[in-house]
Curated annotation (Swiss-Prot):
A quinone binds at H216, S265, F266. The lineage of its organism: Bacteria, Bacillati, Cyanobacteriota, Cyanophyceae, Synechococcales. Belongs to the reaction center PufL/M/PsbA/D family. This is Photosystem II protein D1. Chlorophyll a ChlzD1 binds at H119. Chlorophyll a PD1 binds at H199. Induction: Transcription decreases upon iron starvation.
């Protein structure tokens, strides 16, 4: 009895020390309670991804006994390689290793894909929670994890919500470069994402955010307060932790206000940086919402045959060109699983004028 009590007391003493180490902000890398969840999940996802990318056997992604190879050992390279999504025969079923009769069956049906994405999604949620936790411990505001929620929402949209809406994890995004582009083409063909307002907002956020970032960085760099001689780098004029401003915001404000107009320039550094953070974040949120709506087939606008003349004859537009391109991509997608999409059998084909008429 004495020995057992001593062992339990030593364990109880070790637990508070472990808790203190986990939540300590003095560590070189903060762990946190969310990190306790994040680290093993991301490690499991990364290890399985690397092994599957190198050596996974072909996967019967369409469920028609025609496996698709995605690993290095089966002839792929860094561009064409991917972790192929789980089989359409599995659908939305949870498919851990113990659900398969053999390991070969699990690999053939694309089990590694589910293992990677589930651990990855839990891991990035843990990373987001860890960002909030560290901000809380340091007395900071929580906006860092709010900004990070944008890519988290995008990952959940393509890896979880979209397969749920389409009815199978085989419709999820493959984990590879060519697989990602294939996913984008198929998404355009089936949902016309280019004509969805939320996708347009996402494009505006990405390009606009890049533009604003470049503008802000160049303005700050151009209005630095010189603390060095002409022969030294201006970077040496900054000391980490200094209280003085490192650039002249009045000069930057005046330059940009005269370049465009006065009210296009921020005169408040805090509101400026909040805008730089929130603009791309909100736009990526909207894009994720668009993916989630299209997952349930609430698709982008279709302007096919939308313009007619006084006689009721269709006037071909670029909307018809886009629709024809979508049909072409849809025909090529899963061409062995079905002969052609029903869209092609719905109506007679209409010619699209892409060449100028001959004159004379």
């Amino acid at each position: 009895m004495t020995t057992i009590r001593q062992q339990r007391s030593s364990l109880l003493k070790g637990w508070p020390q472990f808790c203190e180490w986990v939540t300590s902000t003095d560590n070189r890398i903060y762990v946190g309670w969310f990190g306790v969840l994040m680290i093993p999940c991301l490690l499991a996802a990364a290890i399985c991804f690397v092994v599957a990318f190198i050596a996974a056997p072909p996967v019967d992604i369409d469920g028609i006994r025609e496996p698709v190879a995605g690993s290095f050992l089966y002839g792929n390279n860094i561009i064409s390689g991917a972790v192929v999504p789980s089989s359409n025969a599995i659908g939305l079923h949870f498919y851990p290793i113990w659900e398969a009769a053999t390991l070969d069956e699990w690999l053939y049906n694309g089990g590694p894909y589910q293992l990677v994405i589930f651990h990855f999604l839990i891991g990035i949620c843990g990373w987001m929670g860890r960002q909030w936790e560290l901000s809380y411990r340091l007395g900071m505001r929580p906006w860092i994890c709010v900004a990070y929620s944008a890519p988290v929402s995008a990952a959940f949209a393509v890896f979880l919500v979209y397969p749920f809406g389409q009815g199978s994890f085989s419709d999820g995004m493959p984990l590879g470069i060519s697989g990602t582009f294939n996913f984008m083409f198929v998404f355009q063909a089936e949902h016309n994402i280019l004509m969805h307002p939320f996708h347009m907002a996402g494009v505006a956020g990405m390009f606009g955010g890049s533009l604003f970032s470049a503008m802000h960085g160049s303005l700050v760099t151009s209005s630095l307060i010189r603390e060095t001689t002409e022969t030294e780098s201006q970077n040496y004029g900054y000391k980490f932790g200094q209280e003085e401003e490192t650039y002249n915001i009045v000069a930057a404000h005046g330059y940009f206000g005269r370049l465009i107009f006065q009210y296009a320039s921020f005169n408040n550094s805090r509101s400026l940086h909040f805008f730089l953070a929130i603009f791309p974040v909100v736009c990526v949120w909207l894009t994720s919402m668009g993916i989630c709506t299209m997952a349930f087939n609430l698709n982008g606008f279709n302007f096919n045959q939308s313009v007619v003349d006084a006689n009721g004859k269709v006037v071909p537009t670029w909307g018809d060109v886009l629709n024809r391109a979508n049909l072409g991509m849809e025909v090529m997608h899963e061409r062995n699983a079905h002969n052609f999409p029903l869209d092609l059998a719905a109506a007679e084909s209409t010619s699209v004028a892409l060449v100028a008429p001959s004159i004379g």
